[in-house]
């Protein structure tokens, strides 16, 4: 897929894979990269537009979508990883809130823009969704890829 000149949104763009995805999109000539983060993010490239967005806050996510004029590529990257043994309901709920329902909320909020541009959605999942580790089984549940 060519993203030269396209508008790209990366969630979880403040560090790690998300930050690398922003750099990669810029390197491939994206015209605009929206960097979705929970905390404000400064970036030296003028093509980067920081968007303060907590994916677990549906109202904020919807409001953020209203700030974006057009979007061609949505990269759902935001995620968390916590140690758990499935006996801690709070850890399971946190994984689901961010890694499953957060992805859902972002996709729903930006879907009208993507439909208009006939855009693309990329969900960044984990190999641990295919082979869960005993130290973090709850992480694997919402990150599992699904096929139609």
Regions found by a protein language model. Give the residues of each.
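Rossmann-fold cofactor-recognition segment
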Residues: 45-59
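Short alpha-helical oligomerization interface
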Residues: 85-96
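Conserved NAD(P)H cofactor-binding loop of Rossmann-fold oxidoreductase domains
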Residues: 78-83
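Residue(s) in the substrate-gating loop at a strand-loop-helix junction
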Residues: 126
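N-terminal Rossmann NAD(P)H-binding glycine-rich loop of SDR-like oxidoreductase domains
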Residues: 14, 22-23
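Conserved Rossmann-fold cofactor-binding substructure of NAD(P)-dependent oxidoreductases
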Residues: 56-69
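Active-site helix of classical SDR
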Residues: 107, 142-145
């Amino acid at each position: 897929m060519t993203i030269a000149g396209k508008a790209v949104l990366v969630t979880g763009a403040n560090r790690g894979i998300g930050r690398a995805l922003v750099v990669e999109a810029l390197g491939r000539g994206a015209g605009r990269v929206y960097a979705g983060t929970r905390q404000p993010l400064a970036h030296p490239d003028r093509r980067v537009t920081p968007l303060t967005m907590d994916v677990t806050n549906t109202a904020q996510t919807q409001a953020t979508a209203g700030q974006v004029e057009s979007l061609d590529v949505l990269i759902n990257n935001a995620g968390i990883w916590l140690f758990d043994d499935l006996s801690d309901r709070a850890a399971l709920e946190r994984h689901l809130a961010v890694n499953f329902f957060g992805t859902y909320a972002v996709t729903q909020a930006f879907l009208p823009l993507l439909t208009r541009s006939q855009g693309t959605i990329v969900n960044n999942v984990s190999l641990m969704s295919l082979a869960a580790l005993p130290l973090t089984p709850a992480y694997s549940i919402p990150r599992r890829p699904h096929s139609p």
